[in-house]
Amino acid sequence: MSTSPHGRSQTIADVAARAGVSPATVSRVMNGNPSVDAALAERVRAAAEELNYSASPLARSLVLGKTNTVAVVVPDLANPTFHGVLRGLSRAASHDGYHILIADSAEAVAEERILAAETRRRCDGLVLCAPRMAEADLEQLLEELKPVVLVNREAGSTSTPVIAADYRTGLVELLNLLYDYGHRSLVYLAGAPQSASNARRLEGVRAFLDDHPDTAIQVLRCGVNFADGYDAAERVLASAATGVLAFNDLVAMGLMSSLNERGVNVPERISVAGFDDIPFARYLTPPLTTASVPVTELGEQAWHRMWDLLNERAPGHPIIFRPRIENRGSTGPVRPHY
């Protein structure tokens, strides 16, 4: 719909009157229906151009039965990791003429399911980033809301496409790094209990302990954000550990901030490693050792899988990215005098 020079909105009826056809014919032409005679279609387009008329996106979506929009539900929009996923996904979607609708569940499991259902009703597809809901609930939802793509969560018994990082391997490699520095007393600051990626990290802890019986790792319940890491400092110091692996970079940064306020030197007194390699991890003092996850590529691949589903093509096998260890200044050898 557009506005005439006299301020009145032009409608599909105006175009129909100008072209001498029915409104239904205008609708078919404006939405690319090939059944309309070519000469008639050209007359309609000329009338629309004269009136500066274009069909509204809402009207077009009602006619075509699609919105050219895909919903993305994330558990924590404040986390820069999800920014990277969204950046890659939205850029790739835009290339194919699609838009992204973003919803943040704020780590609330009950809210997550509601958001997924509501946003899916308004969009052509759904991408779930690291959903926190229970496996049975997730599998039921995946069947109800197709097409769906999962990011950083396994699909269980469904055929839903999965794009994820190998958090188990990443954590084992960080533990190996600290082990090679001589650390034998470690702490893992665990993420949200309902987080599947936290479960994979815990698998890494157990696998490492099986191979290194001379090492002790205390698992402390923590969280996923800066404040959680900050608040964990007292428990970390009470553990007498010489090295800490945080659930993610935000937790590691919060811990380092609190340790700094207490006069505890990193890494002289205690080594700290994060996970994800968010954009400012390398600019901390000291720069944060972490496992780098290619989040933008994760988002791009999630869109490619969704595009396959939208076009009724088989989406292919799961894509699992192996994190790359970035050994920086927040980790180092055990200091005997401590």
Feature-to-residue mapping (PLM):
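Short beta->alpha connector loops
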Residues: 106-109, 129-134, 250
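Acidic, Gly/Pro-rich loop/turn segments at junctions of secondary structure
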Residues: 125-138, 153-159
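Bacterial carbohydrate/catabolite-sensing allosteric modules
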Residues: 1-5, 50, 88-96, 143-150, ...
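Short acidic/histidine-rich motifs immediately flanking catalytic phosphotransfer sites
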Residues: 119-125, 238-243
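N-terminal helix-turn-helix DNA-binding module of bacterial transcription factors
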Residues: 1-68, 335
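A general structural signal for well-ordered alpha-helical segments in protein cores
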Residues: 12, 23, 41, 55, ...
